[in-house]
Amino acid sequence: MGRLIVVSNRVATPTETKGSAGGLAVGVFGALKDTGGVWFGWSGDVVSETVANAGPTLEQDGAVTFATVGLTRKDYDQYYRGFSNATLWPVFHYRNDLARYERDEYAGYRRVNAWLAHKLVKLLQPDDIIWAHDYHLLPFAEALRAEGVTNRIGFFLHIPFPSPQILINIPPHEELVKSLCCYDLIGFQTDTDQLAFHDYIERHARGTVKPGGNVEAFGRKLRTGVYRIGVFPDEIAEQAKRYESRQHVMDLKQSLEGRKLIMSVDRLDYSKGLVERFRAFEQLLERSPEWRGNVTLVQIAPPTRADVSTYQHIRQDLEYEAGRINGRYSGLDYTPIRYLNQRYDRWKLMSLFRESQIGFVTPLHDGMNLVAKEYVAAQNPDDPGVLVLSMFAGAAAELTGSLIVNPHDSVGMCEALQRALSMPVDERQRRYEMNMAALRKNDLGVWRDTYLRDLRAVPLMKAAPNGAHGTGAGASRKTQDGAPDDAPAAS
Ligand code: ADQ
């Protein structure tokens, strides 16, 4: 079996893949270890042009090579901070109101994709399969094809794919979807995402969609599929139990003084519905005086993308809301919302989940939401907490034992909290068992192995006449900044 080449915007470090990172890194690393291969992408460093062009830096861990490159300031601003996170991220999360479009940022996005492709080509072998991840890399396969690469190339979109009416707000939407069609297999988190893509293909690209997700568009044939990302639930359960008596859990327990605990953990992102969540919790305190002083919401939300301006606003909004609600309902010995702006080790989070009575996960839009799955997996089967989950998380389709809410309905969310806080143990157990069965049926290994099986089954493209893997004509046509000059136009 050929090697696996994983490409993602950020590459986990070899240490992170051994457990401290999210499940994705662990899952992908598992596949890399099986076949041997390369994990290629940005190191997370902003560097000089000389250093960037000298890369990639290679680090070996058994049969796996971690290959990373630095980005120049301009690349970072245009590709990462600009088009990826100020255009694609908001639009793909249905927040056109927060999106901007700048031609030079889009040009930078394409330039960096072409440059990354050029760097990767030198590491490729003929029977490798390539698996690219997420919205930073929509044009990556097209850039590899321009370098003469004929290997199988797959893509998995971790975030929602928006309906065409939303997507067409991005001026070069057609060029982006055309680029996406250079992949051999596109994986989505949910049926809704896949349908939205098919809808675009049929109505805007005049392509065809056949049963089995077979798509023909822009002169290309490709496949699409739904692959719901999961977790390893039994490993999480074991981890949560193992650490349940550690000091941090004891400290939290003691400070709660018998109060019920609602736990929320997210990256600080406007897609996660944090302000709406705080307001729903406020509704609970307002409508149910018996819970005042008797329930605490712990919100853990470390800042991300802090140099993108919309992320500064969400931080301010949230601090304001937490302060306002706490001002209204705090007592000398009671703070209703504990809002923590920091990252926690994974094992700590899992043991805190186990200690809580409610997991409150209410994104406005989310590809899957692994926190919801982790929360369920971390529960004590004898006395499980209840998951209150947004209908707009991909996970809602599988976790049917949860209380499903609409995050725009603060009273509805408040009622779900009331119900969860007083739910009898036999109902909690029944709901937990349903959710746990879904997690076990479709764990992270199933996601990864099914996707890779389907990618390996894609018919291979005919090899280029010179048998090139980037050593042929495509790779030699270079502009000054290192991007192939046959990369698509900037806008
Ligand atoms: P994210 O938007 O990052 O992922 P999510 O799926 O919830 O969202 O994954 C977050 C991961 O980070 C979880 O494993 C969680 O435990 C961890 N995490 C969150 N807050 C943390 C904290 N304070 N400290 C430490 N760890 C923390 C994107 C998409 C999702 C999709 C995933 C995977 O937006 O929709 O589910 O990719 O495909």
Regions found by a protein language model. Give the residues of each.
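Catalytic cores of carbohydrate-active enzymes across secretory and cytosolic contexts
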Residues: 1-491
